[in-house]
Structure formats: structure tokens, C-alpha cells
Amino acid sequence: MTIDTTNESDNSPTNSPGLEASARTFSLNASKMVRITDDYADEVFIEQNDVVIEKPRMDPLHVRKLMETWRKAARRARTNYIDPWDEFNIHEYPVQRAKRYRYSAIRKQWTEDIVDVRLHPDSFARGAMRECYRLKKCSKHGTSQDWSSNYVAKRYICQVDRRVLFDDVRLQMDAKLWAEEYNRYNPPKKIDIVQMCVIEMIDVKGSPLYHLEHFIEGKYIKYNSNSGFVSNAARLTPQAFSHFTFERSGHQMMVVDIQGVGDLYTDPQIHTVVGTDYGDGNLGTRGMALFFHSHRCNDICETMDLSNFELSPPEIEATEVAMEVAAKQKKSCIVPPTVFEARRNRISSECVHVEHGISMDQLRKRKTLNQSSTDLSAKSHNEDCVCPECIPVVEQLCEPCSEDEEDEEEDYPRSEKSGNSQKSRRSRMSISTRSSGDESASRPRKCGFVDLNSLRQRHDSFRSSVGTYSMNSSRQTRDTEKDEFWKVLRKQSVPANILSLQLQQMAANLENDEDVPQVTGHQFSVLGQIHIDLSRYHELGRFVEVDSEHKEMLEGSENDARVPIKYDKQSAIFHLDIARKCGILEAVLTSAHIVLGLPHELLKEVTVDDLFPNGFGEQENGIRADKGQKPCDLEEFGSDLMEIAAEMGDKGAMLYMAHAYETGQHLGPNRRTDYKKSIDWYQRVVGFQEEEELDSDCGKTTFSSFAPLTRHEILAKMAEMYKEGGYGLNQDFERAYGLFNEAAEAAMEAMNGKLANKYYEKAEMCGE
């Protein structure tokens, strides 16, 4: 960057008195100082064969001149700043008191204080749900007051519950954490999400609530939405950021609805697996499916080694235009020389199951580093130490330790380019120079023109003055919390590709190491649920491009609701097959019904010919041969799928397998009648029925279309098999007698006395 220093006052370092003496003093202390800019930090250390070698330090006179030049540029920018809201005379409106509520995403705590504001009574913008007002807030720094910061106060048009506003703040601050983590990977462009809080106008009747954000100057653009919309603007960063959050969270959440000015975003939305938090905009896996259908991995995704989400050939071909736009953007995107670590070398840990809570809730359950872990000892670490233990503490010590620091950060206005601030500076670290993937193993750069001896004295005096490290004491504590937060979170990264998941699982089995991630069923299930949602969206015509003739036909006829929608069956079957491989019960059962020619709810018009257009045989039997299994026909393949669904807990599939083993039908050439297995499946169904009687809410979800059998009917079938014997089951009249009596009692409870008498008669015959 070139800064014009002409027409400045003659106070440059070259004309200052006593320059030579100052230069000598500066040279003596230069060895104890570290660099403040990344432009020259790269010249301090080089790495050869994993050995860090110190290069000659740069000229201190040049550094001093550079620092003075930057100070002049900052003063000039401050002096020439023109408030865009001067014409509205907000300073003429009365000062009002407001209670401000701020949320800490790390500590999951709310803090409140009283602030002075001036609110313009007329709204200047209006959306679908909220309207915006101009506001200025008084920022107090010491004894001075500053009203120069511009804010936007957003109020809901319709009356909403008070909790909705606080949920919106929690959502945006959680998304802001993900933006900070994204910046740590040194993408081509850093991003930031606007700080937001809630203010309550306590001096106004009714104490209305507003969302408060900094005013962003520039052109407001919506890059993507929570329903799969992607802007035509050739921007790679917003889409890569959404993809990044999905993989980094272990498939548990995704930040979408990216909008704002440049790379300063506001009003995002978060999709989670459970789909019940973060408001009505959280579409769960359905929203994730809509995003991946319109998303194509770009250069940033590839550089960060994010996995390509599986799409069918027709889906890929349908987005050639989007790929061309991305190619044009590639030419204009200047990527810094950053080397990212490959996924195969990154270590991630097992992702928590969805029943234990979403990613952010799990990660907050951690311990803050104690005082001894962050203490710098002059005896063991000198000023030039670049060990992993020293670097984070040095960076934290370089930050101010003001109690009002959070307020100061929020009070300074931001512009489109303000994303590269303190968080961005802390993120300038090489995270890709180690094969282990742990950030602590990488070598960040020290930053700041700071004498470390004085730093330690300042740090020790501050620590002694506050006694202990409280949660609100200093920036160091907050940064330590963030480091611990992301240290745990990075271990949950999971690829968004079933093939990558399978390879990761194979690697874990081969390594047999605790540090190698074990792929859980939950990770497969989330990915599979996204694919099953895509298959359902295809069937509903969500991605159908309706031509004018078809549109007129749909709008002009009353019976068109019964006309089947012509959708992309190939893509729907493609996603159904991947969902089946991921172990989604609905996908497994739907595939089984299609193969066996049974009615099914999902993809009703798909037949076995659509599922296997080239015929069933060689490919499927080749896979079975690789697993050491015998070749099968189509009927046995369907029976295998049905048995898998039964093992997964579907009662209809259990009844099907029990009946199949009882009669020997629809089992294929490699299976025969087996009374023992039939009774085993019948017993499982009875067990499920007993659980449902104890608790009606704990019944297993079934996707089968089989007519359920009553308890007394199942018991009677089991009794008949024990009475007859054979097919792997020993004849047992005593057991048959007991089962017939149980069936009779169950029939009496079902108010079927005639059938109960029949069962009692059969029981007496077994007793004779």
C-alpha cells in the first residue's frame, strides 16, 4: 500500500533533533522488540527442513519512519471524516436513556448497562419484518463524550414476544464466532459479522425494544438465503463460509442467509440438525439441502480442502452457468500465498451425537486455562521465544486490558473494510505448516512493537491488582476462552461427502489410534438426511424449471393437482441411494419397497426399472463378492434391505421378515423357511408393542405400508409354530400352550371374546 505524504508538516523523523542519539538507543533495544506488521514479519523467520532460522532484522530507522507515516494517515482520515447523517440533525433530538443487553457467545451470558442515545423518530428503511431508525449513542471514554458513531435501531413491525429479539442477538453473536474461526484460515478476504445488541427505551412509554447495530456504509447485497437462493454476484467468500461452517461444526449447523456490505455481514441465519432453535428461519437439514443443491465448491473451498457435496450429473450440468461465473471470479480474486493443510493430515475427533446437544452447546462445556498455564517465566522463556506456549500469551498481552474494552470496540464505527481488525490480526498465523492439524503445533508470528520485559511487568502488575482471573477481567481471559472454544471445535470437522467419510472411517480402523477420528453413525445420518430431503424436494417439483406452456396448464385446470409433476427422477434416485448408504431408515425402506414392488410414500412413481435402468446383477453381485457374500437376485436384494430396515427398528419391516421366514416367500435363492428366525422377529414386534403401552410417546417411527398385526394375532402365530415344530424349531407343546393362553387374554382385552374362546380351545388341545 502506498501512502501519499506530501504537503505534511516538516516533522518527519529525518528532520527531528537528536535523531542520531535516538537511533542508537533504538538499535540497542531493537533486539528485544518484535514486528507489528505482517509485511515485515515474514522477513524475521524462515523455515528450512523444519528448523527455524532468524534472518537479519530490518533497519529501525525505516520502521520508525513507517510508523510515523501510518500515524499521519490515520490522523488525516480522522480529520477528513464526514458524517453521512449530518443532514438529519440527530443532535437536536432529546437524549434518552436505554438499557442495553449484550450477549457473550463464549460464556453464554447476558450483561446489561445504561446508555444515552438520540433516536430519530422517522424510519428510513423498511423490510418484511422490521423497520430501521437512525440512532446515535454516546460513547464515554474517560471524561469525554463522543456522539459521532452512527447506529441503526431495528424494530419489529408487528408485535412479537420479547424473547424473539434476544434469540436474534444470540444467533448473530454465535455466527460472529464462526466468522472469527473462518478468518483464522487466512482466506483471500477476511469477513466479519456486525455486533448486535438489544436496547430497551426505558424513558419511552411501553419500553419498546430495538435491535442495535452499527450503520454500514456501502451497497447492501444479499449473497444467499436460508432457502437455497444464491446471488448472481460473482462472490466466492459467502458461499465458502457457509460450507465451512457445515464441515467445521461436524454437520451439526450451517450459517446461511449471508447479506451485508462487502464482507461485513449482518442478519445471518443458522440451520441446525435439531431445527428447533434460532427461530423460525431454522429449516434444519432441509435448509442445508437447499444450500448444497445450489452451491458449487469454488477456489476458496478447494483451498480450504472442503469436500464436494455429491450431486447427480443432471444437477451438475444444470449449473454450468454458475460455474462460468465462478471461473470469471477466479481471475479477479487475488489469493495470498497461503498454504493450507490437506484434510488427510488434519486430525479431528469424534463428533458428539445429536441427542447430546448441538455443537455450540457442547463446546461451551470446557474449562478456562488456569493462571499457571498462561504465566510467562523469564527464567525459561526469553524475549525471542517462539514456542507454542509463548506466542498466544504474547499476543494476548499486546491487547489493552481495559474493563470497558467491549464497549470501546462497539463504539467505534466500522466500514466495509473494517473486518480486518483485532480479530483479523490475531488470525494471521500459519496454521498449515504442521501435518498434525493442531493449531497449537503451528508457529504463529509475534506481533507488536513491544518490549517483552516491560510487557511482563505490566502484565504482572495488572494481575496482582485484580487478584485472580475473573470472567470479565481482561482481554487475555476472553482470548483464552476463545482459544479453548475453537481448540475443541476444530476437532469435530467432518467432510460433507460420503466417500470422504468412508475413507476417514477406513483410516481410523487401520490406524487404531485414539487421535484418529472415528466416524459415527450420527455423521452419516446427518449427511444422509440432507440427501433424503433433496430426493423429496425433487419429487415435490422444488427444482423444476416450469416453461410457459406447462405453467399455463398448471394454472388453468382445476384437476391439475392430480397431474404428476415431471421431475428429475435420476437425481431423486441418486440422492435416495446415497441416503440409503448413509443408513437413513426411510431411504433403506423405500429402496426395499421399490425393489420388492410394494407401495411406498417417497418417490411413488419410481419403479424397479427406474432404480436399475441397466438391469440388476453384475455391479451389485460384484460388490457382494468383494464382501465375501453369495450372488443374489433382485428378490433377495430387496429382502436384504428389508432386514436392514427391521434391524433399524421399523415394525413393519419386522413383520415382513417374520412372515417371510414363516412362509418362505420373498427370501431369494439363498434363504429358506426358518421358524426360529420368524419367532425372533415376532418377539421383537411384541416387545415394541409393550413399550408403546407403557409410554405412548416412545413408539418407533415406521415408514412401512404393512397392516399392523395385533398382539393376540402375533402370539397365536408364534404358538402355531411351536405346536407344529420343524424348520429349525423344536416342537414345544408347553410353550405353545402358554402362548395360546396369552393370545386369548390379549383377545379378551381387545373385546374379541369369540376369538379368545378359539385360542383357549387350541391351548387345551396342546395341553392334552
UniProtKB/Swiss-Prot annotation:
Monomer or homodimer. Interacts with cmd-1 in the presence of Ca(2+). Transmembrane segments: none annotated. This is Eukaryotic elongation factor 2 kinase. Its EC number is 2.7.11.20. Calcium(2+)/calmodulin dependent activity. Undergoes calcium/calmodulin-dependent intramolecular autophosphorylation, and this results in it becoming partially calcium/calmodulin-independent. It comes from the Eukaryota. Phosphorylates elongation factor-2 (eEF-2) at two threonine residues that are conserved in all eukaryotes and are located within a GTP-binding domain. Calcium(2+)/calmodulin dependent activity. Inactivates eEF-2 by catalyzing its phosphorylation. eEF-2 catalyzes the movement of the ribosome along mRNA during translation in eukaryotic cells. It comes from Caenorhabditis elegans. One of its GO terms (molecular function) is calcium ion binding. Residues 1-21, 402-446 are annotated as: Disordered.
